[in-house]
A protein has these predicted regions:
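Catalytic Walker B motif of ABC-type/P-loop ATPase nucleotide-binding domains
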Residues: 151-154
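Conserved ABC transporter NBD signature motif
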Residues: 56-64, 71-72
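H-loop/switch region of ABC-family ATPase nucleotide-binding domains
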Residues: 187-188
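The feature captures the beta-strand-to-loop junction immediately N-terminal to the Walker
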Residues: 33-35
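Helical segment within the ABC ATPase nucleotide-binding domain
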Residues: 166-178
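Helix-to-loop junction immediately C-terminal to a conserved catalytic motif
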Residues: 48
Length: 223
């Protein structure tokens, strides 16, 4: 379980995240929404242990993340907004490269299966020839190499076509329900958020998001 308690982040005098508390159970997909600059990426960065909170605590599987950073990182898969893969390498070479950096080792067959699971079959193609959607799928596959229990996805489907979005959504649902992964997911696509997520966290002062989600039937937490 992930437990976030009264988490606050300030940059100088500006408080971006103010006393945020929530928990995530295995198998849950949580949507994070809010206007540009509301603090969604900041929250994901803090959960990924890449930034320190100003106050508050985060526990993952009962371990305090601020204290046990190294072991906590093994349980986290993080896909930032910007695609971070080698353009000149093939899909296969990228997967092998990142497998070498991962703490858990996987056979090539298993690496390939990770890509196939999300309908990415261009194994021998250079990444520079892939579409944006395929690159996002590869980024996601890379984040899964070490079999994390917590997946943090910052706009994983931005700018990609409906079919690829549906494929990624279906795969995330499968990861949550079949493998019990906890997924935190940001998107500006409210239909996608409503369709995919079990619960939704609205960040920021603007009530706009809460208002348009109110009829979704989903549990909404606002901060
Ligand atoms: N290193 C930093 N120093 C100072 N301010 C920062 C820093 N990083 C982010 N901010 C500010 O914190 C606020 C939240 O930024 P963040 O990127 O988390 O928002 P976001 O909700 O992810 O936005 P978007 O939807 O545009 O991706 C913004 O006002 C941003 O300018």
């Amino acid at each position: 379980m992930l437990k976030v308690t009264t988490l606050t982040k300030a940059y100088g005098k500006k408080t971006v995240l103010d006393q945020i508390s929530f928990s995530v159970q295995p198998g849950e997909i949580i949507g994070l929404v809010g206007e540009n600059g509301a603090g969604k990426s900041t929250l994901l960065n803090i959960l990924a242990t890449l930034q320190k909170p100003t106050n508050g605590s985060i526990h993952l599987h009962d371990k305090l993340c601020q204290k046990e950073k190294q072991s906590i990182r093994k349980a986290i898969g993080y896909v930032p907004q910007d695609i971070a893969i080698w353009e000149e390498f093939t899909v296969e070479e990228n997967m092998i490269f990142f497998e070498k950096l991962a703490w858990k080792k996987l056979e090539i067959k298993a690496l390939r299966q990770l890509c196939l699971d999300m309908a990415l079959d261009k194994w021998k193609e250079p990444v520079k020839t892939l579409s944006g959607g395929m690159k996002r799928k590869l980024n996601l596959a890379i984040s899964l190499i070490h079999d994390p229990t917590l997946l943090l996805l910052d706009e994983p489907t931005v700018g990609i076509d409906l079919k690829s979005r549906k494929e990624i959504g279906a795969y995330l649902r499968e990861l949550a329900s079949a493998q019990g992964k906890m997924i935190l997911y940001t998107s500006h696509d409210m239909d996608e958020i409503i369709h995919l997520c079990d619960r939704i966290i609205c960040i920021g002062d603007d009530p706009f998001y809460e208002e348009i989600l109110i009829d979704s039937g989903k549990e909404i937490l606002s901060f």
